[in-house]
Amino acid sequence: MSCLCNAVVFEGEESMSGPVVECVPNFSEGTDARRVGAIVAAMRVPGVHLLDWSMDAAHNRSVVTVAGDPASVVESAVRGACKAAQLIDLTRQQGVHPRIGAADVIPFVPISGIKLEQCAMLARQAGQEIWHRCKVPVFLYGAAAARPDRANLEEVRRGQFEGLREAVVKESSRRPDIGGPGLHPTAGACAVGARKFLVAYNIYFDSADVAMVRAIAREIRAASGGLKGVRAMGVLAQGRAQLAMDITDLEGTPLSSVFRTVTDLARRHKALPVEGEVIGLLPEAACERESDWMRQLTGFDEQTKILERRLAAPLAWPGGP
């Protein structure tokens, strides 16, 4: 696994000579800013830098990005998962985005001086700690998967919280890798894994036709024989059809290729993409500044949304110094 950054310099520090790991927890809460802020604040650990966090009310989901030395990042992720288990009750909400837990997905990503296989070990350590501290069972996925069928995150989340809660009782093959056998009554389970860098990219259309955008999602997702390394779902967000995608292979499937394919498919339905957004951070190598897809991005500030620049100037943690 090649590194995204060879030298990582943090604000107020000359350099970070050791390995750098990124972690991008996804929490099943996107409407309550105080609750999400408390989860983010709980993740503050010496040696960990806050790179990005955002809330998405349409998907009822928040995404946090942190980076730092491996041991500290593991501790940060575990604290965030346990705080989420305290504050989020899945029995009182419905997730628009597929989810199985309050702290739904916690991936570890190699940035500098560390390999994907080592990140898989960190994921397993984090999973053990999450179960030990807050009794939320864990499914291991991606490069950390304990079983081949669980390398695919979609398979792990099949049925969502409501369906999985029943499945683990009836089917031993659906039970967690760590803890259990049942789910936490209100916080569900947590998928913890290791993966390469991923870009979350959403496209909005000049249409409210959900059937149309779901048809496009089926055609482009890798699982249906579409674009390599693409996961996609179609939803109605803010009164518009939205294609929500995870791009897991930026070298094999650059974002310009995704945008062209989506545009061609939309034209068949007499629709056009009118706006795009990146959730989280984008590596410098993925930027194509003269491309149509980048011109359509909203809220994209290169100083805050490009990984390498954010690593050099991390955010202040909520709650003050």
Where are these regions (language model features)?
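Cysteine-centered motifs
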Residues: 3-5
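Long, contiguous binding/interaction regions
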Residues: 17-321
